[in-house]
Amino acid sequence: CEALKLAAQDCDQNSVSISFAPTKDSTINITNKNILHCAFMYTQILKDILLTINFDDSHINEFADNSSELVNVNEIAKEYRDHQPIWWYTRETFLFSVLNRALRLMDADIIIKMAFFISDLHKNITDLHSKQFHDQTSSQSFIVYRGQSLSQTDFNQLKQNQGGLLAFNNFLSTSKNRKTALDFIHRNLGKNEFVSILFVMHIDPSIYSTPFAHVPKINAIDEEEEILFSMHSVFRIGKIKQFSDNTQIWEAELTLTDNNDPQLRQLSETIQKETSGSTEWNRLGLLLIKLAKFDKAEALYTILLKQTIDQKEKANIFHQFGCINKDRGEYSKALEYYEKSLEIMKKTLPANHPSLATSYNNIGLVYYSMGEYSKALEYYEKSLEIRKKTLPANHPDLATSYNNIGLVYDSMGEYSKALEYYEKDLEISKKTL
């Protein structure tokens, strides 16, 4: 029985995923998926979301109602408020495994159902951190350890990103006891194609942007010297080397970062800019669309559509469904959703609202992709008309409209007209780029 427990714990420990941001010399670009890992941005935005949403008992009951097939779910529904979230997380229930799996796979459905618990656990760790480390300074820095098996792909990325940033996408269990981490490694040596690695983590207790806490006194399993970090803890990657006495094991030095880290601050600003949206959930959906995770984006917006009665929000969701299907190449479906969105916006927004211009423009894009150039021109011109009335003369959106109309005339063989609009686009671009 004890062996089975250890095997289950080892499996859960290895399921904690990591993601990488570019090194200091790399260009930050959301469209460069090899440089900026999707999961790094996903969990950062998810963390932002959970800090802005208020949860109550109805969310716990909803989770129980939708998860009745899971063991212990009724106990959790009845007794959830009787214990701290860390107690539930470290107890031998399904919560640990299901939550880490959802964060690893970026499963929007499960994450939304468990959002109340993710939020509560983060707040619990933050509160304990404040109590345990409130009077400590950088001079009292300490080291924690974590043993983990990495896939060869992740290990190669780790080596390639030395000097860059690494994020643990899940909640992260570590130990101040080096032997505890090494025991895990020795139990997993030689398994499959994985690389055994000991993370040696240097922790400045004065860093509050990444909460962590001692948990032995409230840990249901009651392991000693455990430090639990909240999700998306970000570290700077230092030296990576093989053990001198066992070349099967590698050691990687990590240093906890804070919000003052210039690269992390720049990255956070980029994430905010590239995924601006009306709500935090909408930001997450936009990110998934940008990274071509269309099924996950569709699942998220389907849930959001069921939860809202606000007409403007429905219009936005239908618009995003249109974007998803446009990018999939399913143009008839895209038109259907864009037109649903446009119908609502016409009823709820002023006649010259910028969102209407965006909607007309995107419908034009679909018709252009379908080769229906006269229809595309009709909608591009409607978009341009609004933009000329509401935007400054050198606004980039006007340049986009001129370029789009130029492309239509180009495709129709009307080259003099195409040239006229291309030149208008160029004139603005020279002033703004």
Residue ranges: model-predicted function:
Residues 329, 352-354, 371, 394-395:
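Alpha-helix boundary/capping segments in eukaryotic regulatory proteins
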Residues 1-347, 355-368, 378, 403-407:
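Mono-ADP-ribosyltransferase
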Residues 303-306, 342-347, 384-389, 426-430:
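Amphipathic alpha-helical segments of tetratricopeptide repeats
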Residues 347-348, 370, 390, 412, ...:
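Glycine-centered coil turns and helix-coil junctions that link the paired helices
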Residues 273, 310, 349-352, 391-394, ...:
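Short coil/turn linker motifs that delimit alpha-helical repeat modules in TPR/alpha-solenoid proteins
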Residues 334, 346-348, 418, 430-432:
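Polar, glycosylation-prone regions of secreted, cell-surface, and some intracellular proteins
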Residues 336, 343, 357, 378, ...:
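Acidic, glycine-centered low-complexity repeats within long intrinsically disordered regions
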